[in-house]
A protein has these predicted regions:
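Positively charged n-region of N-terminal signal peptides that target proteins for export
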Residues: 1-4
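Hydrophobic h-region of N-terminal signal peptides that target proteins for export
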Residues: 10-18
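N-terminal, active-site-proximal structural segment of metallo-dependent hydrolase catalytic domains
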Residues: 19-100, 105-107, 115-120, 177, ...
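Active-site beta-strand/loop signature of hydrolases that rely on acidic residues for catalysis
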Residues: 30-35, 64-90, 126, 166, ...
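Structured beta-strand-rich core segments of catalytic domains in phosphoester-bond hydrolases
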Residues: 81-176, 292-293
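Metal-dependent phosphoester/phosphodiester hydrolase catalytic core
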Residues: 133, 157-160, 167, 171-199, ...
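Metal-dependent phosphoester-hydrolase catalytic domains
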Residues: 206-217, 224-319
């Protein structure tokens, strides 16, 4: 009798353990958002009389903070981070503005990308601490010298771009996930550099991840649409595929969504069909939904604007 009871107890424990193990499928929401550096805002406003002064960072910071909160991602990659956006200078850091508004659920990962320890078109990752636990994180550079902010002598022009990564553990299932936030050089500066960034991004990502059985996501502003060097290198790896095109090819996107680009003009007067922003996943994850978020938010004078010259993108993934 005791043996039977013991066997029953062991069976119950085994079932409970199985339910808590990585076999359980859950849905996570991930995103990517290029915030448009404060320097870039100043430069473009000075050159463009039609560009509203409400797009200065000091006027748009609260809109960015509200939008990032509303996206409600479990993990999000951020691009074009500078000192004022991060809150190292001034009082308009979007993280503090989010916390002041009551959103304290995110932890943030950033490493200075400048050779002097400054933030210059840097990249970051935010994740909900109730959903994930950070195990490891770091930064590497995409100009051929991975461990410092330098470029190979043969590296194409402008290719000294960063990628921040995190090894995260899902709190409910215990599953491990690698997440990368990257920003490639604009092809207008160097097509070769755009491809070089992509090649270095995936080469080092593969080294970090190791086993192909470990789920991984690369997001960011690739400055490349489908058919351009940076995109084609990532897609051509055979390991990471763009969620937008996965769902589009399967007929799972609304027609209106298939026509959306991820950028707006600097003056907000026209919306581009260009798609430089991407969420790419490996075969360990399943794409369930994708959206380019084109919402306007009130700035300091109460008028509504697109908070950045990029639109955030979000995807739901089965993990």
């Amino acid at each position: 009798m005791r043996r039977i009871v013991l066997l029953l107890l062991l069976s119950v424990v085994a079932i409970m353990a199985a339910e808590a193990k990585p076999n359980k499928k859950v849905t996570i929401k991930v995103g990517s958002y290029n915030l448009m550096t404060s320097d870039s805002r100043v430069k473009h406003i000075a050159k463009n009389a039609d560009m509203s002064h409400q797009r200065y960072w000091c006027h748009s910071a609260q809109a960015i903070a509200a939008q990032v909160s509303d996206l409600d991602c479990d993990i999000i990659g951020i691009q074009e981070v500078c000192d004022s956006i991060w809150g190292l200078t001034g009082d308009k850091g979007f993280r503090k503005l989010m916390e002041d508004a009551g959103n304290t659920q995110y932890k943030w990962i950033l490493y200075p990308n400048g050779s002097k320890g400054n933030l210059s078109y840097d990249v970051a990752i935010g994740y909900k601490s109730e959903v994930f636990t950070e195990l490891e994180s770091g930064i590497y550079w995409l100009a051929g010298i991975f461990d410092r902010s330098e470029a190979l002598p043969t590296a194409p022009k402008g290719s000294k771009r960063p990628c921040v990564w995190a090894k995260l553990q899902h709190n409910e299932t215990g599953k491990i996930l690698y997440f990368f936030s990257a920003h490639f050089v604009v092809p207008g500066i160097s097509k070769e550099g755009n491809a070089f960034n992509a090649e270095n991004c995936i080469t080092y990502a593969e080294k970090l991840i190791g086993s192909r059985k470990v789920p991984s996501i690369i997001v960011g502003d690739f400055n490349a649409a489908k058919g351009a060097p940076g995109f084609d290198v990532v897609e051509g790896s055979g390991r990471w595929h763009d969620v937008f095109y996965i769902l589009k090819d399967e007929g799972m996107l609304d027609e209106s969504e298939t026509k959306k680009g991820t950028c707006n003009a600097k003056n907000e007067q026209s919306i581009s069909g260009w798609r430089p922003d991407h969420i790419t996943i490996d075969g360990n994850l399943t794409a369930e939904s994708f959206k380019t978020v084109r919402d306007k938010y009130p700035t300091t004078d109460g008028t509504e604007h697109y908070p950045s010259d990029h639109f955030p993108i979000v995807a739901e993934l089965k993990f």
